[in-house]
């Protein structure tokens, strides 16, 4: 197994930000910082088709990647898309003051799950607008809420199954900080939080991974919603890296208690070690490190 930095822009304790992009077809990649002034920084190849740069880029800095001197693209592993799926990506700081240190999760036998859509559950359609309703859900006997997919999609309202930025909670819902506040509040009310994730296809608009890393997709399989994700062909190790690190980030950075995997019948993998098995193994390793249960279900 290879060891790579986390994908995307990672703001670090020393005030620098590490940028890592999987762009296996590119011969040259530059990081283009748009704030506070336009700056172009060459990225270095680090193997496996990945490119890396470390520079000063505080939270809020907007950026793109420039491939082979001409094509400027957002970050497929962006944590924030403040101007939508076609706009620049933005650096975020994952630091958050949590209050759920004593949280031990909910036992499997005690789960009573309420599925909700963030955009339609309240008139405001945001993560934080859900918080006042948590006591009501708890008093109904609910022990966990399941959020329909929140990964950034085109526009402001969507069922969530057209997501194209797997690492970015949708901006109109409240983004990174809004989701963390919701999870923290849910745990304070004794409610677990599950997240619906889509690892079988990407949405049709704003999927720049197709252009930046063509091996992420395969024509050997078909889904009804878009190109199948390459989990077992050439360079599929990098695809697994992108997807599995995404799952682990929801658990680690957002304190999500488990993931509901959408349409697992469309996650095609004929390799000896199926990606779902690998995902389950890595999630359980993460649960042991976190000291609380983490569930996967479909």
Stretch-by-stretch model annotation:
Residues 298:
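A glycine-rich phosphate-binding loop feature that marks nucleotide/adenosyl-phosphate handling sites
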Residues 22-29, 58:
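Short proline/glycine-enriched turn/loop motifs at strand-loop junctions of beta-rich domains
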Residues 104-108, 117-255, 263-290, 295:
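Substrate-binding/active-site clefts of carbohydrate-active enzymes
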Residues 33-35:
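Short acidic, flexible loop segments centered on an aromatic residue
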Residues 29-31, 63:
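Short beta-strand elements bearing conserved aromatic residues within extracellular beta-rich modules
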Residues 1-18, 37-115, 120-125, 136:
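The feature marks proteins involved in alpha-glucan
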């Amino acid at each position: 197994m290879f060891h790579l930095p986390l994908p995307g822009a990672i703001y670090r304790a020393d005030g620098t930000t590490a940028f890592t992009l999987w762009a296996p077809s590119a011969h040259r990649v530059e990081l283009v910082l748009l704030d506070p002034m336009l700056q172009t920084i060459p990225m270095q190849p680090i193997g496996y088709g990945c490119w890396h740069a470390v520079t000063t880029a505080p939270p809020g800095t907007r950026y793109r990647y420039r491939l082979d001197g001409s094509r400027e693209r957002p970050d497929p592993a962006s944590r924030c898309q403040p101007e939508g799926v076609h706009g620049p990506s933005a650096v975020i700081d994952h630091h958050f003051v949590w209050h759920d240190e004593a949280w031990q999760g909910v036992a499997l036998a005690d789960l009573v799950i309420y599925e909700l859509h963030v955009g339609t559950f309240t008139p405001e359609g945001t993560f934080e607008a859900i918080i006042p309703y948590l006591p009501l859900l708890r008093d109904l006997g609910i022990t966990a809420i399941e959020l329909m997919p929140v990964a950034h999609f085109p526009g402001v309202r969507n069922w969530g199954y057209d997501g194209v930025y797997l690492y970015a909670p949708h901006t109109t819902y409240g983004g990174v900080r809004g989701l963390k506040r919701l999870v923290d509040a849910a745990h304070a009310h004794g409610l677990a939080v599950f997240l619906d994730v889509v690892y079988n296809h990407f949405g049709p608009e704003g999927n720049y991974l197709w252009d930046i890393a063509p091996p992420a997709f395969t024509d050997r399989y078909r889904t009804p919603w878009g190109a199948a994700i390459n989990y077992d062909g050439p360079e599929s190790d990098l695809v697994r890296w992108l997807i599995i690190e995404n799952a682990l980030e929801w658990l680690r950075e957002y304190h999500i208690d488990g993931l509901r995997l959408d349409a697992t019948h469309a996650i095609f993998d004929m390799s000896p070690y199926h990606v779902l098995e690998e995902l389950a193994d890595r999630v359980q390793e993460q649960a042991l490190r976190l000291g609380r249960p983490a569930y996967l279900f479909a």
